[in-house]
Amino acid sequence: MFAYPGDLSLKTGGYGYDRQVLDGLRKLGWQITLLPLGEGFPFPTADTRRGAETALSSIPDGTLVLIDGLAFGVLDAWAGAHAERLQIIALVHHPLALETGLSDEQQQHFRQSEQRALAAARHVIVTSPMTARELASNYGVASSRITVALPGIDKSDVRRVVNAAPQILSVGTLTRRKGHDVLLRALKSVEDLDWQAVIIGSKSLDPSTSEALARQVETLGLEARVQLLGEVDDPQVHFASADIFALASRYEGYGMVFAEALSHGLPIVACHAGAVPDVVPSDAGILVPVDDAPAFGEALRRLLQSPREREMRSAAALQAGSLLPTWADTAAIISNTLDGIS
């Protein structure tokens, strides 16, 4: 059984990971029942929390239950009460307390609740070595209880479009953690150069941030050069037509879009944030400090002014992308882990 919060069809990295893993496990012969837990996690209403706990409590004894960490981290009381009768596996994309924009009180609450929840899990699956280290060091999870299952990529032929002006692509939900505000300030600093930029990502998860970004584009006078597209049906088209990938995330548990950019041979500008340095090789991308718009702008300027450097970093990106796992590899790792527990 797979229990998840929210809308599994949302075009985010976390939900995309979930969908790919479910598809891969089914291809390997697993029979999976889906159990939706409701909206609003990790800040569920009291009614939503009760509904989720009631649904989970009705699961028969001995069932193997994989639960997405976005909900599991705040279901610590339920997890502790049912740890003995169920085989609970947590799927942690990144610790809840490391989300951007939380108050100190919220961070402490999430850290404590997630630590209690993880203590009740038979095993924990994470999407990056960095998250594994974080849980082992700061959440009391023994390394022997953690399996790393890196996100996969869909290997495909790289199709590149020749652009009159360099095309800068950014992909990430319009939330504060993704740092699009930093990217926009950086783009303003290179407006003397020739470029166009496209930002793809859901506008519905954090409407206030989405609206603020739209206002920022207008305030900076970038309406003619920056498109905020929202969700798109086929982001591959945009990866194929881009020259540079840029995302100023303040934290990433892995950063699936960076892996996607590598597989398309795109030079990358990003931040030293979370697992990003583990994903983006130094010869493929330029990493700058978090929230440093001037440094981000200078990195963009380097790539925009030097086609030769873009070519060199593109070749390095393609090489790194060729070594990344496929989704079949990811599913196989998780399948083997579940086999060892069930």
Regions found by a protein language model. Give the residues of each.
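Conserved donor-binding/catalytic core segment of Leloir-type glycosyltransferases
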Residues: 160-178, 184-189, 198-200
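Carbohydrate-associated surface elements
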Residues: 130, 149-152
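Aromatic "clamp/platform" in nucleotide-sugar-dependent glycosyltransferases that forms part
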Residues: 250
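Short hydrophobic beta-strand element within catalytic cores of glycosyltransferases
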Residues: 267-270
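Conserved acidic donor-binding segment of nucleotide-sugar-dependent glycosyltransferases
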Residues: 282, 286-293, 302-307
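Nucleotide-activated donor-binding/catalytic signature segment of Leloir-type glycosyltransferases, i.e.
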Residues: 210-232
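Membrane-proximal helix-turn-helix segments that form the acceptor-binding/catalytic region
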Residues: 105-124
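Glycosyltransferase donor-sugar binding loop
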Residues: 196-212
